[in-house]
A protein has these predicted regions:
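N-terminal pre-transmembrane cytosolic regions of membrane proteins
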Residues: 1-220
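Hydrophobic alpha-helical transmembrane segments and their immediately adjacent juxtamembrane loops
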Residues: 3-10, 14-16, 370-451
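Short beta-strand-initiation
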Residues: 120-121, 262-263, 433
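Secondary-structure boundary/capping motif
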Residues: 136, 317, 425-426
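Intrinsic-disorder/low-complexity, polar/charged segments
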Residues: 143-156, 309-312, 322-325, 418
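N-terminal extramembrane/targeting module of integral membrane proteins
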Residues: 189-310, 316-319
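Membrane-associated alpha-helical segments
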Residues: 293-410
Length: 451
């Protein structure tokens, strides 16, 4: 079935991680670019429905500036740039909005080499505590005709998500260079290159995460979706239009990652994308759904991505850290559990259904349990090592105590001068025993690490 769309938009999310010591300087670099970036101060009256959608503690986590009074904001704005960046680096979530007067258009080639023109209507940087950030590009295909070929949407999503500094080769060559377009990889590189953690740059994906809405034409019957189902899965898994893949209708995994609460709407979830596929015959799908999908549900994706990257980061730190860093790791993991690990985020039943599906798609409960298990094993290792050292120290003191008790007894029956050499040898042995143990343990640790 050849599908046409009446309306569409796609958010492309580029995730990147900044080392904690560089995070304030990254924020400072954005604050200094006053002609390009503006910090978002959330105001309750501007979007009451979206803010009220989330539970109170979620509002404080996602929109902390919502709770800043006018006096504090005025004082904050008068502070120096670096002072502001230090304060913002301790904030749970901050957002910067790009001046779109500088960028509006872009072009990319499809599978057949045809040019797809698109508009960039919004660019944001969203950063969570710990330096986990996202660049969010909101795009729409620039189509002169009333209806958009669905294949064009598939190709656009598939190729645009490759436009990152991490992708090399042919994907980058699909950018069409001219005076009116923007080079997306270069744009990203200018923001992140000096600050992005190189050791973590592939901890998620080389490609951007795709979050896409499409309203299709001529979907009037339930049976129509069956005809469009394979194209929907291509949309969900960000495949290009020429892909010959035919999805297995009996695969349980496919059904686990889709959700339909209302007629003529289908949500799709994966670790690469989030999509909604709706009909223009349903009024809600063309009036409220586009708004809710990006104003409410998009934040769920950001939270899920933030949690997943944080947990993977913890896991990598457990493998890399020196075994003396247990206190710092415990502090960070406890803080994450207390302030950033959410089970309930909204009172909306539909919203909670979507949130649970995102948790499932990203495997968050399993990943959280795995990290805790790794930490407990790590903690047990450190504790057992420390216990061994304490036991060794106690043993040394015990040997010294016994030795000198014996010496004291001998002085009562033997001339003191005769045992001076013995005393010196015993003291030297006792003094050198623990340093010798430390050196031997260090050598053993190095050999174990090497082999």
């Amino acid at each position: 079935m050849h599908i046409k769309a009446k309306y569409q938009y796609t958010h492309f999310l580029y995730p990147f991680v900044i080392d904690s010591e560089k995070y304030p300087y990254f924020i400072e670099s954005i604050l200094k670019k006053t002609k390009e970036w503006t910090m978002v101060y959330h105001q309750y009256k501007s979007d009451e429905e979206s803010y009220d959608f989330f539970l109170p503690y979620m509002r404080k986590f996602l929109f902390p500036s919502l709770f800043w009074d006018k006096k504090y904001i005025k004082k904050f704005k008068t502070q120096g740039v670096f002072r502001r960046s230090l304060e913002l680096s301790k904030t749970t979530c901050i957002t910067f909005k790009y001046n779109m007067a500088r960028i509006k258009k872009g072009s990319i080639t499809d599978f057949d080499g045809k040019v797809i023109n698109y508009d960039i209507s919004d660019i944001k940087i969203i950063c969570f505590e710990g330096g986990i950030c996202f660049i969010d590009f909101k795009t729409q295909i620039d189509e002169k005709s009333e209806l958009i070929d669905f294949n064009k949407i598939l190709d656009f999503n598939h190729y645009f998500r490759n436009l990152t500094p991490r992708i090399k080769g042919s994907a980058i060559n699909r950018i069409v260079e001219n005076s009116k377009t923007v080079n997306i990889p270069k744009f990203i590189r200018n923001i992140t290159s000096e600050y992005e953690s190189k050791s973590l740059d592939k901890m998620y994906f080389d490609k951007m995460f795709t979050y896409s809405y499409v309203c299709v034409d001529d979907w009037e019957k339930d049976t129509d979706f069956y005809k469009m189902q394979n194209d929907f899965y291509k949309f969900q898994y960000v495949m290009h239009s020429k892909s010959s893949a035919i999805f297995n209708e009996e695969c349980d995994r496919l059904f686990d990652n889709v959700y339909s609460r209302w007629k003529y709407s289908m949500f799709g979830f994966s670790r690469e994308s989030g999509v909604v596929f709706v009909s223009d015959k349903e009024k809600y799908d063309i009036t409220r759904m586009p708004y809710n999908f990006e104003k409410r549900y998009l934040y769920m994706v950001l939270i899920a991505l933030y949690q997943r990257i944080s947990l993977i980061n913890f896991s990598q730190n457990l493998m890399r850290q020196d075994k003396t860093a247990v206190k710092k790791l415990k502090k960070n993991l406890t803080q994450f559990t207390n302030s950033s690990w959410f089970g309930q985020i909204t009172n909306s039943e539909h919203g909670m259904d979507i949130w649970k599906l995102w948790q499932k798609a990203f495997g968050l409960p399993e990943l959280y349990d795995e990290v805790h298990k790794e930490y407990l094993e790590y903690y047990d290792y450190v504790v057992s090592n420390n216990q061994s050292r304490i036991s060794m120290i106690l043993m040394i003191f015990y040997v010294i105590n016994i030795s000198f008790s014996g010496i004291q007894m001998l002085t009562n029956v033997i001339n003191l001068e005769d045992i001076q050499v013995y005393i010196i040898i015993a003291m030297v042995f006792s003094a050198l025993s623990y340093p010798t143990y430390l050196i031997a343990s260090w050598i053993k640790h190095k050999f174990e690490k090497k082999f």
